[in-house]
Amino acid sequence: SGALGVQLTISRPVQRAVEAVAASTMTSGCILVLDTATAAVRASVSVPCYDPENLADSLQAENSPFLNRALQSYAVGSVFKPVLAAAALEAGLQPVFECTGAVVVDGQIFRCAGGVPHGQVDLPAALEKSCNGYFIRLGQQLGAESLLDAAKDFGFGQSLPLAEGFAAEAGQLPTPQELAQSGQLANFSFGQGSLLAAPMQVAAMFNTIAADGVYRSPYVLQATLDETTGQPVETLSHPRGRRVISAQNAALLRAMLVQVVQQGTAQDAAGRSGGAGGKTGTAQTGQFTPEGTERCNLWFAGFWPAEKPRYTIVVLQDGAVHTAYSGAAIFAQVCNALEAAG
C-alpha cells in the first residue's frame, strides 16, 4: 500500500467561512467550532495568522502570529460560571441570594459589573445578569473540593490531546491550599484568580452542556488515507464520552444559557435564525497599555441552534482594549456563516 496521509475533521466550507468572520472582526484572538454530537473540530482560526511568504517578519511581529491561540492558556472570567451552575444543579441546589452590587470576602470587595445591584437573584437570573456576587456565594455553599472536582470533570487543568504530538495546554487550576483562602475561592467562583484555560478546553466544557451532559474530548484527525489513491485506510477511533452531568440538568442549563442570549448580557449573540445559548466573559489579565488601560480577554462561548445544537462555538479576543465587535456579536456572525455553509 502507498504512504499514509491523514484526513482532518476540519470542514473546508466552515473553516473558510469562520476565517472570513475572524478577518473582518478581530485583530487578535481565535474562533473554534466543534461538531456538538462528536466534538470533532470543524474550524479552528487563530488571528493574526503568520505570512508563509515572509516568515522572518512574522517571527519578529509583536502580535505573535505563530501562537495557536486556540491551544494557549488564558484567564477565563465568566464563561466559567456554567461549571458552578452545573455543580449546583447536580447537588440539587438552586439558592436565591440578594445581590447588593458587591460582596465583601476576607476584606476584599468583589463587585458586579458597574457595581449595579441585581436584587433577588436565582440561578437562571444569575447567569442571565452574570452576577458575580451570586456565584461567589454559590461557591461558598458548594465548597472548594466540589468546585475543583466539577472543573476537573469538565476537563480543566489537564492537557487536551487533539492528535499525536498536538495538544491544548493544560492551563491551571488553583490548588486546594489556595482555595482554603476565602478570597481565592471567591475569585475562582467567577472564573478569576489563578484559573487559566485554553479556548479548546472552554469549547469542550460548553460542548458537554450542548451534548446532554456527556464530555467528549475534541479531536482533529478523522482517518488515515492511502496517499496514492486518496482513499481512507482506517477511520481513527476516539475515546467514548463520559457523563459529567445528567441529561436533565444539561437541558436545564441549556435553557438558562438560551435565556442569556434572549434577554441577558448576550443579546447581540442572536444570529438570523435558530436561536442560540451561551455566555459572555471578560477576564482581567493584569496587563496594561502604556496609557494605563487594562487589557482584557473577551470571551463568548455557546451553542447553535438553541434546540438540538449542531455546533459549539468559542470566540476569544485576547489582550483587548477597544474592540469593534463584542464576542457575542462575532458569535452571531459565525452562526449566520454556519447556516449559510449548510
Language-model features, listed with the residues they occupy:
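Periplasmic/cell-envelope proteins involved in peptidoglycan metabolism and beta-lactam response
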Residues: 1-56, 95, 145-153, 270-271, ...
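Beta-lactam-recognizing serine transpeptidase/beta-lactamase-like catalytic domain environment
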Residues: 35-78, 83-317
